Amino acid sequence: MSLSNSLGLLGRKVGMMRLFTDDGDTVPVTVVDVSNNRVTQVKTEANDGYDALQVAFGSRKASRVTKPEAGHLAKAGVEAGEILKEFRVTADVAGKYAAGTVVPAADIFAVGQLVDVQGTSIGKGFAGTIKRHKMSSQRASHGNSRSHNVPGSIGMAQDPGRVFPGKRMTGHLGDVTKTTQNLDIVRIDEARQLLMIRGAVPGSKGGFVTVRAAIKAKPTAAKGAN
């Protein structure tokens, strides 16, 4: 399924836990809260030049919303959300929803389905090349003097006389958008609108994530959990 026709859900990473399968195996899962995903706008080919659904998640104080945003949300009849995201979908999918509709998790996903989860990785501050780029340390002795954890040469001198763009060097580590692909859904708690996804997803507890159908792998049946 391509990104151009897949509707996803916005959520908040609750944390990690483990489930047990019918065979007694333990499965590490990440719990994602996808409750109250509401449609704020339905875009169509005729009006906007493409088909898409705009979805809001979370809640925000009215005092924190700009007047244009307040008018946009009032037109849809929904409360302000912490995050707003647009999903490109087909005309058939867009026709199933109207502004103000709450999208349940079971309408989009099923147990055993493979999904891609996008979030902001945990920021780790300023880091050296060994931690940031997985480079190797230099020799501990045998002629090495105070150059144990330095990256080494970063370019030539007179020609070209500069450091090429993209050279892996020290800098800020983390706090970037990351996507973990092909994770399967182990369980869906419809009462609390929770997705339990096998493995780890980007970000810290309480961070926002986007969950959508996997675009690269073929779906495979996952073992059911109790």
Swiss-Prot record:
GO cellular component, one term: cytosolic large ribosomal subunit
Keyword annotations from UniProtKB, A to Z: Methylation, Ribonucleoprotein, Ribosomal protein, RNA-binding, rRNA-binding
GO molecular function, one term: rRNA binding
Domain of life according to the entry: Bacteria
Pfam families (UniProt xref): Ribosomal_L3 (PF00297)
Free-text description of this protein's post-translational modifications in UniProt: Methylated by PrmB.
Disordered, as annotated region: 135-158
Modified residues (N5-methylglutamine): 158
Stored HAMAP family: Ribosomal_uL3_B
Role played: One of the primary rRNA binding proteins, it binds directly near the 3'-end of the 23S rRNA, where it nucleates assembly of the 50S subunit.
Subunit and interaction comment: Part of the 50S ribosomal subunit. Forms a cluster with proteins L14 and L19.
Family per record: Belongs to the universal ribosomal protein uL3 family.
Name of this chain's protein: Large ribosomal subunit protein uL3
Gene name tied to this protein: rplC
